[in-house]
Amino acid sequence: ALGENINVMSKKGMMLVDMGAGTTEITVITMGGIVVSKLLKMGGNTINAAICQFVKERHHLVIGDKTAEALKIELGHAIPGRGKQKRVFGRDLITGLPANVEVADHLVFDALKDYLFQVVKTIRNIMETIPPELSADIIESGIYFTGGTTLIPELDRLFSASLHVKTVFADKPL
């Protein structure tokens, strides 16, 4: 928050969402204090593991974490339907030999959506439990997002549409 010139000492309530590699932290602050904070033990690494699992189940191909990360970066999108593909290499589960397949962006979206749904659900739950004055402040100022996982394209559109709140993404999320 401090790196993005957000005044954490403000009397206005703010929601900060840090979408990191290993965890996602959703925090509401006001006057320099934490009102509520929820830590999800999931993040970008969770998405990578899901991509590995989806490729394994749908293509019978074992891929590594670096390949999953490349798929997430190149095909990952919070809104489905771009129609892009990427060829990946791995080990065929049936023959045990090296093999390659074309992975479609909708597979990567399928791997992303459970994580994104959980983040939206947690933000909604927090918004429902905080005092109305803080909710009003957050609706006015928006929800602030940071962390490497926020680099997934169209997250702003997804969160704005799902939460009906303005979203503000860090210029330098890492």
Model-derived regions: residue spans:
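Active-site nucleophile and cofactor-binding loops and adjacent substrate-binding regions
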Residues: 1, 41-42, 169-174
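Conserved phosphate-binding catalytic cores of ATP/NTP-utilizing and phosphoryl-transfer enzymes
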Residues: 1-17
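Conserved helix-loop functional segments at active or binding sites
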Residues: 6, 125-133
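Short coil/turn connectors at secondary-structure junctions
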Residues: 9-13, 23-24, 140
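A short acidic Gly-Thr/Ser loop motif
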Residues: 16-23, 29-33, 43-45, 123, ...
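Phosphate-binding glycine-rich/basic clefts of nucleotide- and phosphate-handling proteins
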Residues: 30-117, 128, 138
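Glycine-rich phosphate-binding loops at beta-strand->alpha-helix junctions
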Residues: 80, 135-159
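Conserved phosphate-binding/catalytic loops in two-lobed NTP-binding clefts
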Residues: 157-174
